[in-house]
Amino acid sequence: MELPTLSKTLKFNHVIEVVEFLNYNIITDVIMDKKAILHIEGPVSCKIANMMMKYNIDLKVSSAFGGNIKVVHAAMLSLAKTQFTIDMKYATTPLVFVDIIVDRTNAAETTANAVIHLPMVVKAEYAAVINSGLIHTSMNIFVLPTTLVARRFKGYADLNLAEKKVKAELFWDAEKDANKKLSLTTSFTVDSSMRKILIQ
């Protein structure tokens, strides 16, 4: 593809090589006036078997500005478990890491965990457990960890479906002062006729 309306000519070359069924190699080049400014290359694979699907993308991105970015993306989807991962690095320096897991292997409950990490910006961890009588969620977020204004936010919430009660706590400076917190304890009723949840 060419874009002649620009002061420079921009070309995109994209090749998909079929290695085998559901396995490919991707090569993409962006060229400006015969000079390569971006190159993307790597395998893409997918596997489907036994009510489960997996796919994996492993790309290397290089540019005229120097350095390589490694992008790894993987996912697994099944009735029992779901996982989603992104891992990006500049050379050996981490840029972005995301890992989300939902586990349904225990018939009595569902668990979920998530990690989101942007170095020097935020590292956040979330968790949840859901069963027939209780929904428990928690979080642990560390913001600007390498700076003087670093702050950790921690908290949890319990929704007791059997007793119709809610309990929650949020610490907004958990790293330095455990007394800086908000607490909530309340009960609720469900009015099915009005389709409302009433907080007491």
Language model features: what each stretch is:
Residues 1-200:
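Beta-strand-dominated lipid-handling architectures at cellular/organellar boundaries
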